[in-house]
Amino acid sequence: MRVRGHVLTVDQPRPDGGKDTAPTPVELFVASVASCTTHYAGRYLDRHGLSRDGPAVRADFRMADDRPPRVASLSLTVDAPSLPAERLAALRAVVSHCTVSNTLADAPDMRVHVRCEPEPAEMPQAVEHGHVEAARHARQTGTECPR
């Protein structure tokens, strides 16, 4: 997968048909929330002239027991050992509203379109300018275009 020229590798565990060479899409989703939280924490610390040494974000998640498959709960813990106690509430407020967290709190409209072109182009998955395009060759997905 390519994102703004960067290459991300995504895979599945062996029991799920993958080779377990990279994180799963769900793990990348959770990492996205954690990294957004980390970014906002860093910006807060920088803005207030506080040390960035030591802050870390841990993300724990649980999958739903019922269908459809989805993340049922997500818990983030921000460790900021050098943060003065009087700034804890402010940091919590800032990191609770990172862009990814805001998106989860107010879910976007999501539509999935399936297209079939006469000759599907082999194209890597890409995220560009807020637009996601993904295509795979029909032989790779097992789908065939009507002729």
Predicted regions and their residues:
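Extended beta-strand/beta-hairpin segments
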Residues: 1-31, 41-147
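Alpha-helical metal-binding/catalytic segments enriched in His/Glu/Asp
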Residues: 36-37
